[in-house]
Amino acid sequence: MIVLIDADSLIWSSCYKQKETPEDSGYHNIEDAKDKYNEVVMKIINTIEVDYEVDKVITFAGARGNFRKQISKTYKANRIDREVPPILNELQDYVKEQYQSKQGYGIETDDLVATYWTNLTDTFGRDEVIIVSIDKDYKQLPCIIYDYHYKKQCYHNITEAEAKYNFYEQMIMGDTADNVNFCKGYGKAYCKNAFKDCLSDYNYIRVVFSLFKKIYKQ
């Protein structure tokens, strides 16, 4: 099994600790952050090794630039004022040095992971690659995902049909975390009903196109 780790969220969360006093910043020092990151990664790999024989681990983190922001100025604009952990860049550098993490330019980390997943599954087969991430966007791929979130710690085995549905559902629902919502008021219930007879990409595209045409009257 080839394990692809999207480490962005893990690096971010490794910067934080529980506040011990009201004056506490809530951030780890760099050495504690490294230890936390290493500990969680080892736990993830050990968990996967219970079910699969791990042949290779590839880490992805710290993408620079994003073509989506050139298309839409509102993309992730809701995160502009978010405080960035002061040791974030240093921890990213550590992961790059210690784990030889792959870094995307002009794209996001999940774009790079998806590209690697596609190429590797073409070569070794879909059941020989697993993505490690808490990001729901990967459910748009017919892949095996390990969600390491402490409340979940579970596998998702996404079928072709599920991946297709998830892809077109997100075209309508958008993603509030990324400040993407072009069809306000249309959620899961709408998609479930609108897509109930859809099988092909053409079926889905007709539904999505009709809705956008209705909303934007173009």
Residue ranges and their predicted role:
Residues M1-D93:
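Domain-level signal for Mg2+-assisted phosphodiester chemistry and nucleotide/NA-binding surfaces
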Residues Y27-H28, Y52-V54, N78-Q218:
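Extended two-metal-dependent nuclease catalytic cores across DNA- and RNA-processing enzymes
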